[in-house]
């Protein structure tokens, strides 16, 4: 029954031929392009540079187990500069730590359960930002990162893509920090 419904929709083929080790990269690119153009929108290219300014720092946070930095990340977009705050919590481990990028529904450590201390206790760093500091979850594309690019094409990027883009900019910054093991970021 489902196969009949799919045939009736006359969908384009996802890939001509069989997927194997030799053509996997091409197949993956086709799938990513389909999702971009038909579902989530096309994400603009990464900026040339991500700038970071430490706005606040506490070297003895979370019961003395970690350093906390509030960092303002900024980068240039089509319609100007965009910046948003990221809170970095880095364990006092004496070595490079794995890190979790955590787009939060609430501002840093203000409401609800955020397992920051538990994560630090396991030797992981944490990079937390509130999704609303990037762009609000509504149909308005005039605030935050949403205002930084022109709109009008059918495959313009959406809010999920913008939050993912922000996660990537956080990663760009994390990769510059010796305290973070850049090969172990989730």
What does each model-found stretch correspond to?
Residues 95, 99-186:
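Cap/lid segment of the alpha/beta-hydrolase catalytic domain
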Residues 15-16, 27, 84, 97, ...:
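Aromatic-residue detector
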Residues 1-83:
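N-terminal targeting or regulatory segments adjacent to alpha/beta-hydrolase or S9 domains
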Residues 79-84, 90-99, 122:
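Proline/glycine-enriched tight loop/beta-turn segments at coil->beta junctions
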